[in-house]
UniProtKB/Swiss-Prot annotation:
Name used for this protein in its record: Cytoplasmic tRNA 2-thiolation protein 1
Keywords recorded for this protein, A-Z: Cytoplasm, RNA-binding, Transferase, tRNA processing, tRNA-binding
Function: Plays a central role in 2-thiolation of mcm(5)S(2)U at tRNA wobble positions of tRNA(Lys), tRNA(Glu) and tRNA(Gln). Directly binds tRNAs and probably acts by catalyzing adenylation of tRNAs, an intermediate required for 2-thiolation. It is unclear whether it acts as a sulfurtransferase that transfers sulfur from thiocarboxylated URM1 onto the uridine of tRNAs at wobble position.
Cellular component annotations (GO), alphabetically ordered: cytosol; cytosolic tRNA wobble base thiouridylase complex
InterPro entries, per database record: CTU1-like_ATP-bd (IPR056369), CTU1_C (IPR032442), Ncs6/Tuc1/Ctu1 (IPR000541), Rossmann-like_a/b/a_fold (IPR014729), TilS/TtcA_N (IPR011063), tRNA_thiolation_TtcA_Ctu1 (IPR035107), UPF0021_CS (IPR020554)
Lineage: Eukaryota, Metazoa, Ecdysozoa, Arthropoda, Hexapoda
Pfam families, alphabetized: ATP_bind_3, zn-ribbon_14
Bridged cysteine pairs (disulfide): none
Length: 342
């Protein structure tokens, strides 16, 4: 027997929302999904009229839905935003080269300018070459660090006011779990922020419009909207630490469907004792990009690769980082002595 749509629109329901349990027809689900994202944008004041916003586009379901919804809401509610696409090519054969075709499709569909930056262009390395050097045990460390900085570099090149990323509720809950398991108190609180960075701190802000959107609903939205997205998993991802947190979260969700939002809200309410030493975010003296250490992690990892010591910067506070920091200090001291001689 057909179940009527819970919004009393007169149509039959076709789904039960994973997030709320509401039975909705396709049209009402679309509207509810889009309205929730709009409300998040408004309540958190993520954008201001006239801003140039770069959408971090990978071609996957999250960034594809983000590009579609941002384009739709920008017109529906007259945000007055200048939307562009920013993609990073890590140099993973059979994965990123194919996903960039989907990004190009988004560019054509929504008429958004697209800028693609590659690891080869920025660092002189591709992930294929990096994995050949270090193996698959720590490859995600390199990729994550380089990708975060690449987005900052791309945002600066495109002269945007902020970067919108496709992080969804599942992603954030997984990150909370990972940081708890690692005992990383600094990142544990920051990972729940819907907006990070600021122009005052000379960093281009990043925002997460999909912060409260469930991954299951993003997939359903993309499927029923017939959006074209790239669904193949990264060939280097199976060994990622995040996979264990994801599996744990899925098990929790089976027992308690609200577990995802519960974990996010717990992270948001977390308060760290004043006696706990927190890293101070500044600017790397070598590359000029945001960092909480000198030199930044990207510079340490890159130096290791270039010197034939690919594991130089691996670890929470690696020997390599201490060595590079000491070299930086010695160079500054030498420069100071030379300056005094004149």
């Amino acid at each position: 027997m057909p179940v009527p749509c819970g919004s009393s629109c007169g149509r039959n329901a076709f789904m039960r929302r994973p997030k709320t349990g509401d039975t909705l027809c396709k049209e009402c689900f679309f509207l509810a999904f889009e309205t929730e994202i709009h409300n998040t944008i408004q309540q958190e004041q993520l954008f201001r009229p006239g801003e140039k916003v770069a959408i971090a586009a990978s071609g996957g379901k999250d960034s594809t839905v983000l590009a579609h919804v941002m384009n739709l809401l920008n017109k529906r509610y007259n945000y007055g935003l200048d939307l562009v696409l920013l993609s990073i090519d890590e140099g993973i054969t059979g994965y990123r080269d194919d996903s960039l075709k989907t990004v190009a499709q988004n560019r054509d569909d929504y008429g958004m300018p697209l800028r693609v930056l590659s690891y080869q262009e920025l660092y002189g390395w591709t992930m294929d070459r990096i994995v050949a050097e270090i193996g698959r045990s720590n490859n995600c460390t390199f990729c994550g660090v380089f990708r975060r900085q690449a987005l900052d570099r791309g945002a600066r090149l495109m002269e945007v006011d902020c970067v919108a990323t496709g992080h969804n509720a599942d992603d954030i809950a997984e990150t909370v779990i990972m940081n708890i398991l690692r005992g990383d108190t600094a990142r544990l609180r920051r990972c729940c922020d819907i907006k990070t960075g600021s122009k005052e701190a000379d960093t281009i802000p990043r925002v997460k419009p999909l912060k409260y959107s469930y991954e299951k609903e993003i997939v359903m939205y993309a499927h029923f909207k017939k959006l074209v997205y790239f669904s193949t998993e990264c060939v280097f991802a199976p060994n990622a630490y995040r996979g264990h947190a994801r599996a744990f979260l899925k098990d929790l969700e089976k027992v308690r469907p609200s577990a995802i939002m519960d974990i996010i809200h717990a992270g948001e309410q977390l308060q760290i004792k004043g006696t706990v030493k927190k890293p101070v975010r500044g600017v790397c003296g070598r590359c000029g990009f945001v960092s909480s250490q000198q030199p930044c992690k990207a510079c340490v990892l890159l130096e290791g690769l270039n010197r034939g010591l690919p594991k130089l910067g691996i670890g929470k506070k690696s020997k390599g980082e201490r060595m590079v920091a000491l070299q930086e200090q010695q160079l500054r001291e030498k420069a100071h002595l030379v300056k005094n001689d004149f």
